[in-house]
Amino acid sequence: MTNIRKSHPLIKIINHSFIDLPTPSNISAWWNFGSLLGICLILQILTGLFLAMHYTPDTTTAFSSVAHICREVNYGWIIRYLHANGASMFFICLFIHMGRGLYYGSYTFLKTWNIGVILLLTVMATAFMGYVLPWGQMSFWGATVITNLLSAIPYIGTTLVEWIWGGFSVDKATLTRFFAFHFILPFIISALAITHLLFLHETGSNNPSGIPSNMDKIPFHPYYTIKDILGILLLILTLLTLVLFSPHHLGDPDNYTPATPLNTPPHIKPEWYFLFAYAILRSVPNKLGGVLALALSILILALIPILHTSKQRSMMFRPLSQCMFWLLVADLLTLTWIGGQPVEHPFIIIGQLASILYFSLILVLMPLAGIIENNLLKW
């Protein structure tokens, strides 16, 4: 009799994906973040589902329904803060996961990488719409400012913005549709994540050396299941520490004031994980130019496989490229800091220089470093 694990139509798929999957024997802790993202997604869907049971997507009651969840629903406060801070953990894992792909050359798996870029855009859209739902001051003004950017598109811009709003300003119709999209998108993300895994398992995982490891593979279970469980426990520990000790630390105080179109907050800014893109947007004086820079700051990731010039896949043995990579990380941290600062000297010029450096690193300096390293190999 054959093992049910290998013969059952459904269990067979799980077996090939998580149990008998041949995995490189030398993948480091940086490879843990894919499974952590899966855990984050499950956590967000579950907490979001319970929040949706008590939330009302209406401009008059949205803010008070969130207050009701925190005050009167059994353990509502922990569900709400797990969901809000879970989004931050999601993005931390996402940025590290992408950084690892960039460092070790995983972007050469074209299909997997492109699905990953689509996943990033979908997760960003979901997080943005989720931030609007509590209907605080920053929710309302954030929605107004970001959706208004589309009006920079020539000819159809204004019509497009009013179509998204469902009226002539951010109002009840906008909140209702944002709630509907925020509810459905995580399920689309789940489908995309499965596709992402499907394409990954077509080629097998990359490893730190970037060298094909077909002659040295080990089964995923028990080696990497144990390793993933350790990562999951550390993730849960970090998230619970954040939720139980400082749940508001990553939020904005302005969002605890109910939304009013009559007065604007002194500094409109998105959640911390969008600040780097927001800084790039603000660093261009022209509106359309800013919107294009904002879009390109994310879409440029799709160009990275084309810009790979090195004969080696991974940066493990490429010190010059490593310097460029860490310069990019430092630049993104600088942009994140600038995005949260007011628009005044010296922050304007720092933001502009950091934005120029961001695009220069990806489009010019990193490919150039690859070419230089290729020539050094000939010596």
From Swiss-Prot:
GO biological-process terms attached to the record: mitochondrial electron transport, ubiquinol to cytochrome c
| Cofactor dependency | heme b
A cellular component term, taken from the record's GO annotations: mitochondrial inner membrane
Pfam families linked to this entry = Cytochrom_B_C (PF00032), Cytochrome_B (PF00033)
Disulfide-bonded cysteine pairs: these are none
- Which residues are recorded as binding heme b b566? 97, 196
Q: Which InterPro entries match?
A: Cyt_b/b6_C (IPR005798), Cyt_b/b6_C_sf (IPR036150), Cyt_b/b6_N (IPR005797), Cytb/b6-like_sf (IPR027387), Cytochrome_b (IPR030689), Cytochrome_b_C_euk/bac (IPR048260), Cytochrome_b_N_euk/bac (IPR048259), Di-haem_cyt_TM (IPR016174)
Coiled-coil portions = none
The membrane-topology field of this record reads: Multi-pass membrane protein
The record's cofactor note says:
Binds 2 heme b groups non-covalently.
This molecule's function is given as: Component of the ubiquinol-cytochrome c reductase complex (complex III or cytochrome b-c1 complex) that is part of the mitochondrial respiratory chain. The b-c1 complex mediates electron transfer from ubiquinol to cytochrome c. Contributes to the generation of a proton gradient across the mitochondrial membrane that is then used for ATP synthesis.
Q: What name goes with this protein? A: Cytochrome b
Origin organism is Diceros bicornis
